[in-house]
Curated annotation (Swiss-Prot):
Gene3D superfamilies xrefs: 1.10.10.410
PANTHER family in UniProt: GLUTAMYL-TRNA GLN AMIDOTRANSFERASE SUBUNIT B MITOCHONDRIAL AND PROKARYOTIC PET112-RELATED, GLUTAMYL-TRNA(GLN) AMIDOTRANSFERASE SUBUNIT B, MITOCHONDRIAL
Protein name: Glutamyl-tRNA(Gln) amidotransferase subunit B, mitochondrial
Region (Disordered): 28-57
Transit peptide endpoints, chain numbering: 1-48
GO MF annotation list: ATP binding; glutaminyl-tRNA synthase (glutamine-hydrolyzing) activity
UniProt record, GO biological process: glutaminyl-tRNAGln biosynthesis via transamidation; mitochondrial translation
One Pfam family per UniProt: GatB_N
Keywords: ATP-binding, Ligase, Mitochondrion, Nucleotide-binding, Protein biosynthesis, Transit peptide
Reactions accelerated catalytically: L-glutamyl-tRNA(Gln) + L-glutamine + ATP + H2O = L-glutaminyl-tRNA(Gln) + L-glutamate + ADP + phosphate + H(+)
Function: Allows the formation of correctly charged Gln-tRNA(Gln) through the transamidation of misacylated Glu-tRNA(Gln) in the mitochondria. The reaction takes place in the presence of glutamine and ATP through an activated gamma-phospho-Glu-tRNA(Gln).
Organism: Ajellomyces dermatitidis (strain ER-3 / ATCC MYA-2586) (Blastomyces dermatitidis)
Length: 604
C-alpha cells in the first residue's frame, strides 16, 4: 500500500516567468481552463518558449557525449606526446570523497502530474499545467513513480522510511518555472544504505580486496526543463522533462581514491540498471554525478570540518555535473592536486563550487561561499506525507532480480558460462543489461542445438567472445548502437554451433556473422550452402605439400625454429599455409600439427 496524504491548504502562488526577468517570445496555447489543472498537451498546438536573458553566457554548441569522450581521449594522448610529467604521489595526504548521484527513474508518468514522462517526443508535447507552474495548478503525486525508487533503495540495502515528505528548494532559473524544485531534503524515503565494492569493480589497489561505502540517504525529486542555448543569449526550453522523477543518491565521505570513486559510480549505475530503476546510464545522460573533495595532512591533527556525521575532514569543494566515469576520476585527481598545491604553498582551501570540462587538466571555480545560493528549504504545503506499506516493501524484496555481484559470480563460476573476469564485468555493464540478456539467450539456444554432442556444455566462453568481441567489433566499426534484432540470437547460436562442429572455419563463421549483421535475410544454413562455406578438410598429403612449400620458401625461419627453439614462429607458417592454400579448407590446428612434425622431426 502506498498512500499520499493530501494537504487541505489552498493553491500556493507561483512566481511568473516575467518576475524572473525573462521574455516569452511565443505564448503557450491553452484551450481549456479545467479546474483540475492537469492536461496532456500532445493534442495541442506545438508550444515553445524563447527565453532571452541579459546575463552573458558562453555560446558553446551542444556536443554529444560520445564525441566529448573521444575529444577527451585525444587531448590526453596529445598531452602524453608532449612529455607531460608523471602523476605526483601524495602519500603524505589523505583524500576524502563523497558523491551525489542524480538518476532518471524509469517511469511512464511524471512525479507530480499525469503527463507522460517521455522526453524524446516533440518538444513541449507532454506538459501538464503544473509542469509550467500556471497559477492555480497543484502537484498530484503519482504513486507508481515510487516503485522503481524503492527497488533502487532496497538494492542498496537502505532502510525504507514508512513516512517521507516533500520539501521546496527555492532558486530562480529559466529551467524551473515554479521558482523552486520539489525534493526530499528533511525526510527522504530511504536512509542508511551501503554498497560493497570488490577488486573486479576497479577499486584502487590500496583498498585491497573490497571496501564498503555507506549511503546516507536516497531522496526523490523532480527534474527541470531541458534548455538549448542559441546565439544572442537566447534559450529554447522543452518542458517535457519538468517533473520527470529523479532520485538523488548521497554517499558518505568514505572514499579515499579517485579510482574507487569512479568504481562507486559505475557500481551504483550497474545496480540501478539491474533492478530496472533507471532509463539509461551515464553514457546517455541518464545519470550525472557531483563529487565533494577534501584533503588533509596525515601527520597533522584531524581537520576541523564535518560532513554527513563524519568529523576530522579538510575543507571540501564540490565539483558539479560530471557526465562519465572517466570524468569523475580525472576531476577528483585534478582537484586533489590543486588543493594539495595550495596547502603546501601556505594557502587555505575555500569552500566553493567548481566545474570540470572533458579533456581538461584542472577544475575551474564556478562560485565561492559568497555566491552560494540560500535555497530556503521548507515543507511543501501542497503535498502531504507519503506512507509506504510493509506489504509493498516485502513484495518488491521477493521479486528482486539478481544484483551485479551475484550476476558476476554466476558468469565466472557457473559451468554454463565460465566467462573471464574482464568479459563478465563488461557483459554486465554494457547496454543497460541488454547485451547480457542476449548472451544468455544465445547460450540457451546453443545448449539446445548441442544436446547430441556432450552432456557437459562448455560453449559459454566461446559465446561470450562472439557477443562481446566479434559482434561488438562490427557495432563499433559501423558506429551503431546495440540492437539484439540485428543478429538474432538464433542465428548467432547456429553460427557458433557450425563452428564447434568444424563444419565451417573461423573465417567463414566471421563472414557469416558479417552477412547477417548487414541484413542478409537468408537463414544461416541457406547462406552456408549458397556461398559454399561448408568446410571440406584437406587430406594429409595436401597439408604436407603446403607445409613443405612454405618451409622451402623460408629456410631461415625454419632454422631459427630448429636451432633456437623459437616455436612461436610456427603460427606464422600456419598463416602462410592459409594464404597459399584455400583458407576455407585449412584447419589451423591440423596445419600446426603437420608443421611441428616436419620441422621438429627433421631436426631430431
Amino acid at each position: 500500500m502506498i498512500r499520499q496524504c493530501l494537504s487541505r491548504r489552498g493553491a500556493y502562488s507561483r512566481y511568473r516567468l516575467a518576475a524572473r526577468g525573462v521574455e516569452l517570445a511565443e505564448p503557450f496555447h491553452h484551450q481549456s481552463s479545467r479546474p483540475q489543472g492537469r492536461r496532456n498537451w500532445s493534442s495541442s498546438p506545438r508550444c515553445s518558449l524563447d527565453i532571452r536573458t541579459d546575463t552573458p553566457r558562453s555560446r558553446s554548441e551542444y556536443v554529444p557525449l560520445r564525441k566529448q569522450l573521444k575529444e577527451e581521449a585525444k587531448a590526453k594522448r596529445a598531452a602524453k606526446r608532449k612529455g607531460s610529467a608523471p602523476p605526483a604521489k601524495h602519500d603524505d595526504w589523505e583524500l576524502t570523497v563523497g558523491i551525489e548521484i542524480h538518476a532518471q527513474l524509469d517511469t511512464d508518468a511524471k512525479l507530480f502530474s499525469r503527463a507522460s514522462a517521455a522526453i524524446d517526443d516533440i518538444p513541449n508535447s507532454n506538459v501538464a499545467l503544473f509542469d509550467i507552474a500556471l497559477p492555480g495548478s497543484q502537484p498530484l503525486f503519482q504513486p507508481s513513480t515510487l516503485i522503481p525508487a524503492l527497488r533502487a533503495a532496497l538494492a542498496m540495502n537502505c532502510d525504507i522510511q514508512r513516512v517521507s515528505r516533500f520539501d521546496r528548494k527555492h532558486y530562480f532559473y529559466q529551467d524551473q518555472p515554479a521558482g523552486y524544485q520539489i525534493t526530499q531534503y528533511y525526510e527522504p524515503y530511504a536512509k542508511n544504505g551501503s554498497i560493497w565494492l570488490q577488486e573486479h569493480d576497479g577499486i584502487a589497489r590500496e583498498d585491497g580486496e573490497g571496501v564498503q561505502i555507506g549511503i546516507k540517504q536516497i531522496q526523490m525529486e523532480q527534474d527541470t526543463a531541458k534548455s538549448q542555448e542559441l546565439p544572442s543569449s537566447t534559450y529554447l526550453l522543452d518542458f517535457n522533462r519538468v517533473s520527470r522523477p529523479l532520485i538523488e543518491i548521497i554517499t558518505l565521505p568514505q572514499i579515499h581514491s579517485p579510482a574507487t570513486a569512479a568504481a562507486c559510480v559505475r557500481k551504483i549505475q550497474a545496480i540501478l540498471q539491474s533492478v530496472g530503476a533507471v532509463t539509461t546510464g551515464m553514457e546517455m545522460g541518464g545519470l550525472r554525478a557531483d563529487v565533494n573533495v577534501s584533503v588533509r595532512k596525515r601527520s597533522e591533527e584531524a581537520g576541523d570540518h564535518e560532513y554527513h556525521g563524519i568529523v576530522g575532514l579538510g575543507q571540501r569543494t564540490e565539483i558539479k555535473n560530471l557526465s562519465s566515469f572517466k570524468a569523475v576520476e580525472d576531476a577528483i585527481i585534478a582537484e586533489r592536486d590543486r588543493q594539495i598545491a595550495v596547502l603546501e604553498a601556505g594557502g587555505t582551501i575555500e569552500g566553493e563550487t567548481r566545474g570540470w570540462t572533458l579533456g581538461s587538466t584542472e577544475t575551474r571555480k564556478l562560485r565561492g561561499k559568497e555566491g552560494e545560493v540560500d535555497y530556503r528549504y521548507m515543507p511543501d504545503p501542497d503535498l502531504g506525507p507519503v506512507v509506504i506499506g510493509e506489504d509493498v516493501i516485502c513484495d518488491l524484496q521477493m521479486k528482486m532480480p539478481l544484483l551485479p555481484d551475484a550476476l558476476f559470480q554466476m558468469l565466472v563460476r557457473n559451468p554454463k558460462y565460465k566467462l573471464s573476469t574482464a568479459d563478465a564485468k563488461t557483459m554486465i555493464e554494457l547496454d543497460d543489461g541488454q547485451r547480457l540478456e542476449y548472451y544468455q539467450d544465445v547460450v540457451d539456444i546453443l545448449i539446445g542445438l548441442q544436446t547430441d554432442l556432450s552432456a557437459d556444455f562448455s560453449g559459454g566462453k566461446a559465446v561470450g567472445n562472439w557477443v562481446l568481441h566479434e559482434l561488438g567489433g562490427l557495432l563499433t566499426k559501423s558506429s551503431l548502437p546495440w540492437d539484439s534484432g540485428r543478429v538474432p540470437a538464433q542465428s548467432l547460436a547456429e553460427i557458433i554451433d557450425l563452428l564447434s562442429r568444424k563444419e565451417i572455419t573461423s573465417s567463414s563463421a566471421k563472414s557469416l556473422l558479417a552477412m547477417v549483421f548487414d541484413g542478409d535475410k537468408r537463414s544461416v544454413a541457406q547462406i552456408v550452402e549458397d556461398e559454399n562455406l561448408r568446410f571440406q578438410s584437406l587430406s594429409r598429403g595436401e597439408y604436407i605439400a603446403l607445409a613443405e612449400e612454405v618451409m622451402r620458401q623460408n629456410p631461415k625461419m625454419v632454422s631459427e625454429i630448429r636451432e633456437k627453439g623459437q616455436l612461436g614462429k610456427i603460427g606464422w607458417f600456419v598463416g602462410q599455409i592459409k594464404r597459399i592454400g584455400d583458407a576455407n579448407r585449412v584447419e589451423a590446428q591440423k596445419a600446426e600439427e603437420i608443421l611441428r612434425e616436419l620441422i621438429l622431426k627433421k631436426n631430431s
